[in-house]
Swiss-Prot record:
Subunit (UniProt): Monomer.
Protein name per Swiss-Prot or TrEMBL: Large ribosomal subunit assembly factor BipA
Cellular component GO terms held in the UniProt record: cytosol; ribonucleoprotein complex
Species: Salmonella typhimurium (strain LT2 / SGSC1412 / ATCC 700720)
Enzyme category, top tier: hydrolase
Outcome of substituting N536A: No longer binds to 70S ribosomes in presence of GMPPNP
Result for mutant: T544P: No longer binds to 70S ribosomes in presence of GMPPNP
Lineage: Bacteria, Pseudomonadati, Pseudomonadota, Gammaproteobacteria, Enterobacterales
Effect of K509A: Still binds to 70S ribosomes in presence of GMPPNP
GO MF annotation list: GTP binding; GTPase activity; guanosine tetraphosphate binding; ribosome binding; rRNA binding; tRNA binding
């Protein structure tokens, strides 16, 4: 029944608990059988999402509550996955904004909420984690209201219902002093405040594909919301792509969501979010319609990429030892496969057959792709992320980001100085009276590349940093965020030995310990000065029959610095690459031998 259908998207900042909230909604509605084993954080389906605690792909689930059926779409919180967010908004009639009762709305919440308002959706606000120490729900409600006013919300959008919840304990209420035993107030609010889909049941079929899934058994699965009409298995349809080309196809199965599973359905009606198989190669934004009434829905717009980097074939001496897929053809095939469902990604071939230029919405967007490829057994070398400049009205412009930092007062000075050097403008400063300060900045994207790891060191790991893309504006002159220190480069291939590493410790910090395999041109540490230094880490202690009268000195090594993929990408300079294999992340110079490096430097100077 169409009157009993509700479509809703969940918006939240990373770590404000939306995925846990969906868990509880599913469990308490009785959608899961009493016998079914329930996983924690059911919505984060791939390993990477579970490890990082972030949602990357938008996902769908459906809940039966009393006689109502509620379709819930989980949206990614990061602006880097803006391409995903854009499409979700076209499928739903309202949004559930989940905000932490202590943190309040964050810049990434702002990004997604802005998109929702642009689509004319009305919000329901859920203040989550009201049981956490230091929770200040009333302050958060004021902050949310201010945010909505800043985003030019209409009067209807500003008249939003507020539900207080503690998703972990599975309780909700209309007042944070007086909570119900379970989530009923939230279900009730969804049913009361979300409009039923406004669609035409009797017209000819029309639906738009807003997500794609793939399954080896049935091939490409298109997911979307039926705009009007009905669809049955084995029905003949016409598909229109974004360029207006049409082709005919026959629907395989029609699947509706229930809980986390997809269930075969004999018929699906307008307003429902369904998955459909058997239509061959589909693309996002394709319209599926009745062959007698071929009309396309407006194409979904996606934000343009702002950061690009080169993916190259791994040319190091250890190439092919750890990974299964190493050739340029395999890398290109994998990137093209990613393009099918990762809409905000761009891949271009370059003059060099072994390098591809990959552009995305931000460092996180690209590093998630690299991490996924690495887990699948790929080996590749990647360059430093670079910002994409645009020419607008004859003027060269660069992307700017809104950054929110939350730091302890003692670190405030050094953080503000560092952001000043990186050409950031302070927009707002808000001390919370308990020793922490929230700073709001607008900063060029290139000023942020490499800043996160420096920021973590500066605040001894206590600082929080969130950023989202803001706008394009004129370029600020001068270089930003150059690395201050040089690096230590290995001069040969073999096993690093403790005796040699011990002698190098005075020169800087090392990336590897005793027994690690190294090759010529690999970066093995950070130099304590600003120049690069080629060093020998392979020489063991010579054995002679002469011994000092005392005992030998004990060789004690400081534990090496282990870098994650993001840290390595932020650390490198333009003449360096990160070598990524399934088991290790190494950093190397683009030119491996010292002679090649000198020649390259000479060439640059002559230019």
């Amino acid at each position: 029944m169409i009157e009993n259908l509700r479509n809703i998207a969940i918006i939240a900042h990373v770590d404000h608990g939306k995925t846990t909230l969906v868990d509880k909604l599913l469990q308490q509605s009785g959608t899961f059988d009493a016998r079914a084993e329930t996983q924690e954080r059911v919505m984060d389906s791939n390993d990477l999402e579970k490890e990082r605690g972030i949602t990357i792909l938008a996902k769908n689930t459906a809940i039966k509550w009393n006689d109502y059926r509620i379709n819930i779409v989980d949206t990614p919180g990061h602006a880097d996955f803006g391409g995903e967010v854009e499409r979700v908004m076209s499928m739903v009639d309202s949004v559930l904004l989940v905000v932490d009762a202590f943190d309040g709305p964050m810049p990434q919440t702002r990004f997604v909420t802005k998109k929702a308002f642009a689509h004319g959706l009305k919000p329901i606000v859920v203040i989550n984690k009201v049981d956490r120490p230091g929770a200040r729900p009333d302050w958060v409600v004021d902050q949310v209201f201010d945010l909505f006013v800043n985003l030019d919300a209409t009067d209807e959008q500003l008249d939003f219902p507020i539900i207080y919840a503690s998703a972990l304990n599975g309780i909700a209420g209309l007042d944070h002093e007086d909570m119900a035993e379970d989530m009923t107030p939230l279900y009730q609010a969804i049913v009361d405040h979300v409009p039923a889909p406004d669609v035409d049941l009797d017209g000819p079929l029309q639906m738009q594909i807003s997500q794609l899934d793939y399954n080896n058994y049935v091939g490409v699965i298109g997911i979307g919301r039926i705009k009007r009409g009905k669809v049955k298995p084995n029905q003949q349809v016409t598909i229109i792509d974004s360029e207006g080309k049409t082709r005919n196809a026959k629907v395989g199965k029609v699947l509706t969501h229930l809980g986390l599973e997809r269930i075969d359905s004999n018929i699906a009606e307008a307003g429902d979010i369904i998955a459909i198989t058997g239509l061959g190669e589909l693309n996002i934004s394709d319209t599926i319609c009745d062959p007698q009434n071929v009309e396309a829905l407006p194409a979904l717009s996606v934000d343009e990429p702002t950061v690009s980097m080169f993916f190259c074939v791994n040319t190091s001496p250890f190439c092919g030892k750890e990974g299964k897929f190493v050739t340029s053809r395999q890398i290109l095939d994998r990137l093209n496969k990613e393009l099918v469902h990762n809409v905000a990604l761009r891949v271009e071939e370059t003059e060099d057959a072994d390098a591809f230029r990959v552009s995305g919405r931000g460092e996180l967007h690209l590093s998630v792709l690299i991490e996924n490829m690495r887990r699948e057994g790929f080996e590749l070398a990647v360059s430093r992320p670079k910002v994409i400049f645009r020419e607008i009205d004859g003027r060269k412009q660069e992307p700017y980001e809104n950054v929110t930092l939350d730091v302890e007062e003692q670190h405030q000075g050094s953080v503000m100085q560092a952001l000043g050097e990186r050409k950031g403008d302070l927009k707002n400063m808000n001390p919370d009276g308990k020793g922490r300060v929230r700073l709001d900045y607008v900063i060029p994207s290139r000023g942020l590349i490499g800043f996160r790891s420096e920021f973590m060191t500066m605040t001894s790991g206590t600082g929080l940093l969130y950023s989202t893309f803001s706008h394009y504006d004129d370029i600020r002159p001068g270089e930003v965020g150059q690395r201050q220190n040089g690096v230590l480069i290995s001069n040969g291939q073999g096993k690093a030995v403790a005796f040699a590493l011990f002698g190098l410790q005075d020169r800087g910090k090392l990336f590897l310990g005793h027994g690690a395999e190294v090759y010529e041109g690999q970066i093995i540490g950070i130099h304590s000065r600003s120049n690069d230094l080629t060093v020998n880490c392979l020489t063991g202690k010579k054995l002679t029959n002469m011994r000092a009268s005392g005992t030998d000195e004990a060789v004690i090594l400081v534990p090496p610095i282990k870098m994650s993929l993001e840290q390595a990408l932020e650390f490198i300079d333009d003449d360096e690459l990160v070598e990524v294999t399934p088991t290790s992340i190494r950093i190397r110079k683009r030119h491996l031998t010292e002679n090649d490096r000198r020649r390259a430097n000479r060439g640059q100077k002559e230019e």
